[in-house]
Every structure is written in C-alpha cells, then in structure tokens.
C-alpha cells in the first residue's frame, strides 16, 4: 500500500474514532433516561423513524406512542449526537406549556424556517422562538382575531362553504368518486385567501393551479428535509429543485399581494382590518419585507392546511359512523333547518357537531404537538433531565393513551359532552398557553360552517378500498384522498321500471 493511501486510511479511521467518541460523550448525559434500544450506534433511533410503515398508515407519532406506553412519561430519543425527550404527563404539559419561562427550541424549528436553503416561515409567528420578538408580533396580529373581526368573517365562511356544496351537489349521483381531501383543501384555501388577505384564489373553480401545486410540493419538501442526507442523494435533486422553486413562488405571491394592498392604501381606499393589514403594521419600520413575507407564508400555509385536514379526517371517520351522522343531521335540521346562511349564533347551538369536531382532533390532530427548550437541569416526573434539551409534547400521543382516555381508539364524541369531565392538559390540538394557535377560533368557526352545510345537504359514502391511516406532510393528513360518492340528503333509488 502506498504511503498516501495509508495516510488517508489512518486519517479516516481517526476521524471516525473521534466522531464515535463525540457521539458517545454527547449521549452519556442521557443514558439514565428510559428509552428504547438504539438500532444503530451512530444513527441512534433514526432507523426506527424510517420503519414507521407510513404505507400502512402509521406515522412517526405512532412510534412515539408505542415508546410512551412501554417506557413511561419521560422517554429518551437519540438521533446522531442529539437527544430529545418525549414528555407525556399532564403535570409536565401544564408546567412547560403554560409558562412563558420555556421557549420553543430554535434547533427544532429550523426545518420550518428554511427548507433546503430557501427561507420559508423564517421568523414568522409559528417559528419565531425568541419570546420578545414573538410577543411584539403577536400583540399586533391579535387584533385581526377580535370577536368583532371573527363575526364579520361569517359572510366569507358561508359564501365559500355554499360554493363547495353547490359543486358537490352537481356530482351527487351516488356514483362519481370525489376527492374530499382536494375539495376541502381548495375550500380552506379560498376561505383563508379572502378572509386573511382580501384576495380571491377561486381554487374551487379550478383556478390558481400553480399555487396549489406549489403548496403541495412545499409541504412534501418540509417532510423530506427532515432526512439530513436528502440534499446529498442524487435521486433527490429533482425534488429539491422543485421544492425550492415552489417556496420562491409562494413568497413571490406574497410580494404581489402585499404590493396590491399597499397601492390600495396609497389610493386612500378603505381596507379590511384583516391579517394582511396587521402583519403590515407589525413590520412597520423594517428594512425589508422578509419578515412580512415570513408571516404571509405562515398564515397562508398554517391557516388552510390544518383546517382542510381536520375536515377531511372528520368526513373520513363519519363515513363509518352512521349513528353519529344521524345525530348530527338531526341537530343540523333543528338548528338551521333549510336556510342557506348560518348566523354566528347558530354555531354555539350546534353542540353535538362541536363534540364531533373535538373528538376528530383528539384522534387525528393535524398539528400533532410542539417543542420546548429545557435550559436548565430539571427533575421531570422523577427523572433528571439535563439542561439544553428539547422536550417534545404530543397531543396525538396523549390523545391515544388509555391512561388518559378510556378506549382511546374508539371515536366517541360524548367524551366532550356537557356533563363529561374535561381533559386537563392531555388534549391540546391548538397547543396551550401563550404559544397557543392564534387562529383557533377562526379555524373552529370555519370547519363548523363547512361541516354543517355538508351535513345539511349531502350524504357521503367512502369508496371501497380507501384506508383509514395517516401520512405526514408537515402536518398529519389522511393516507388516502378520502374518495367519496355523494347523494343529496333524503335521496332514494329510483323504483324499478314496471314489467312489460
């Protein structure tokens, strides 16, 4: 062997040895914390993530659920030299999510701030981890979610939901398969664009296809970017290019919409006190528009994707719950009858629909959880956790544990009935505390209007072969597109022709 090759081999062995020593030392602080065996020394638990069987409808949160059941309320997770801790006790959820002392962990939110080198959510309201900077934004944007502002949005909710139902009624022959995932996504996008930014996207009418495709590619890119090796794999180059182009396209859409609003303001036109108005105010005095575009992308994506998936999961589950559907139809008939416009007051009277939507979020939360940074060593549920550790809190995991919910895999809206005990710090689909979702009331009103109109006018049946599993594309969504055949309410098959 030549001296050069010998030297190179020695250098590689030395580097490998140093890497192993570094990984071992980094993990040694956590070895006392319960957790599953690592299938790989260097990769840690990463191979477990790859084997989660998304083809069968299992997602990463199902792996964490298995570990929480087996190892208790504090579970160690190793990936390379990094360690996170899954926490699943109500006491700890209350302690860490309800206090302003514990911030989001910036390392865990980098996957949203930039994706494959392109700025996506940046320092927007979801991904900003510095409390002071986040609070400055939140205080201004909160004004767009006042009660009076939300009530004024009922017109938009009704308009777009009515448009959806009319399109579906035209396909309601009991035979034509319809992707409810797609239709509900277009509806949520149209609602969000008009309510938040004063723009008409007309997704339901087949317009803006490049925009919907860009959103789809971007969401797939967020998930793909979690594989730290993805950017180095030759087979991923096309996807990386498409994801980057999609992100640039989305931010350009934001620039165009912002420019239109600024021009309207210059002309002295009256503009709504919507989200766009408030994020313009929040970024007054900024040197450039990048922070403003961060919040545009944040609200445009988070504001429609979670609602669309919530609706799709609900339709999927109701397709196998005829007794629950019958109760819902009876309530809708009593509260709104045949009228086409739902009033704000009607929403509060749809009690059982509220229960169904909450139960859907328990089993199928599109936003599965959140992270907090533990800065100092702390005793958590009797286990010493070192400082500078990311803590993971999952409403998906806790919502499916029989420790907190009896028969947790059964869809039972009565868990949220008026006389039922409230789940305390075991159910947080909109997070909790100061970092809870700013748009949760908006989302709850929106999905209630859409579901009420669907139940009022249509019956839906899942096409045979559709699976009830999940997949992850930044958020959790149904594994299949929720293909349904539709019929008008009260539809009866035509009688057979009389004999000749």
Swiss-Prot record:
Family matches, as InterPro entries: CYP46A1 (IPR039983), Cyt_P450 (IPR001128), Cyt_P450_CS (IPR017972), Cyt_P450_E_grp-I (IPR002401), Cyt_P450_sf (IPR036396)
Subcellular location: Endoplasmic reticulum membrane; Microsome membrane; Postsynapse; Presynapse
Purpose: P450 monooxygenase that plays a major role in cholesterol homeostasis in the brain. By promoting constant cholesterol elimination in neurons, may activate the mevalonate pathway and coordinate the synthesis of new cholesterol and nonsterol isoprenoids involved in synaptic activity and learning.
Residues that bind heme: 437
Family, similarity comment: Belongs to the cytochrome P450 family.
Top-tier EC class: oxidoreductase
Official protein name in the record: Cholesterol 24-hydroxylase
Keywords: Cell projection, Cholesterol metabolism, Endoplasmic reticulum, Heme, Iron, Lipid metabolism, Membrane, Metal-binding, Microsome, Monooxygenase, Oxidoreductase, Steroid metabolism, Sterol metabolism, Synapse, Transmembrane, Transmembrane helix
Cofactor: heme
Family matches, as PANTHER family: CHOLESTEROL 24-HYDROXYLASE, CYTOCHROME P450 FAMILY 46 SUBFAMILY A
Species per Swiss-Prot/TrEMBL record: Homo sapiens
Transmembrane segments: 3-23
UniProt pathway: Steroid metabolism; cholesterol degradation; Lipid metabolism; C21-steroid hormone metabolism
């Amino acid at each position: 062997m030549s001296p050069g090759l010998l030297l190179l081999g020695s250098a590689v062995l030395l580097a490998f040895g140093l890497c192993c020593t570094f990984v071992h030392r980094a993990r040694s602080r956590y070895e006392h914390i319960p957790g599953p065996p690592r299938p790989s020394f260097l990769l840690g638990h990463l191979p477990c993530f790859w084997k989660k069987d998304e083809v069968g409808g299992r997602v990463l949160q199902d792996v964490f659920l298995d570990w929480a059941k087996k190892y208790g309320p504090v579970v160690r997770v190793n990936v390379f030299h990094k360690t996170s801790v899954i926490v699943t006790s109500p006491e700890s959820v209350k302690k860490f999510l309800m206090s302003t002392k514990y911030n989001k962990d910036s390392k865990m939110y980098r996957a949203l701030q930039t994706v494959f080198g392109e700025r996506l959510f940046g320092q927007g309201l979801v991904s900003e981890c510095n409390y002071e900077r986040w609070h400055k934004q939140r205080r201004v944007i909160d004004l767009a979610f006042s009660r009076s502002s939300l009530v004024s949005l009922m017109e938009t909710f009704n308009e777009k939901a009515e448009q959806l139902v009319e399109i579906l009624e035209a396909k309601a022959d009991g035979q034509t398969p319809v992707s409810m995932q797609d239709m509900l996504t277009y509806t949520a996008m149209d609602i969000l664009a008009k309510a938040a930014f004063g723009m008409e996207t007309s997704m339901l009418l087949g317009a803006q296809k490049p925009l919907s495709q860009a959103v789809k590619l971007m969401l797939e890119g967020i998930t793909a970017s979690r594989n730290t090796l993805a950017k180095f794999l030759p087979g991923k180059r096309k996807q990386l290019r498409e994801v980057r182009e999609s992100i640039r396209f989305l931010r350009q859409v934001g620039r165009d919409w912002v420019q239109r609003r600024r021009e309207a303001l210059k002309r002295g036109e009256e503009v709504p006190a919507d989200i766009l108005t408030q994020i313009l105010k929040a970024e007054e005095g900024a040197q450039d528009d990048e922070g403003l575009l961060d919040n545009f992308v944040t609200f445009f994506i988070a504001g429609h994707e979670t609602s669309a998936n919530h609706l799709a999961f609900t339709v999927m589950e109701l397709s196998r719950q005829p007794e629950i559907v019958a109760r819902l139809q009876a309530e809708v008939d009593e509260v709104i009858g045949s009228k086409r416009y739902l009033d704000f007051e009607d929403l509060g009277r749809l009690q059982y629909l509220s229960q169904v939507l909450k139960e859907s979020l328990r089993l199928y939360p599109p936003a599965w959880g959140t992270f907090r940074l533990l800065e100092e060593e702390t005793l958590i549920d009797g286990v010493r956790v070192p400082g500078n550790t990311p803590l993971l809190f999952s409403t998906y995991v806790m919502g499916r544990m029989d420790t907190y919910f009896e028969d947790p895999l059964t869809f039972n809206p009565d868990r949220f009935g008026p006389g039922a005990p409230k789940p305390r710090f075991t159910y947080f689909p909109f997070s909790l505390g100061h970092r809870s979702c700013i748009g949760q009331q908006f989302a709850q009103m929106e999905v209630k209007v859409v579901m009420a109109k669907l139940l009022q006018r249509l019956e839906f049946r899942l096409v045979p072969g559709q699976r009830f599993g999940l997949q992850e594309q930044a958020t959790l969504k149904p594994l299949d597109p929720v293909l349904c055949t539709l019929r008008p309410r009260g539809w009866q098959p035509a009688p057979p022709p009389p004999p000749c």
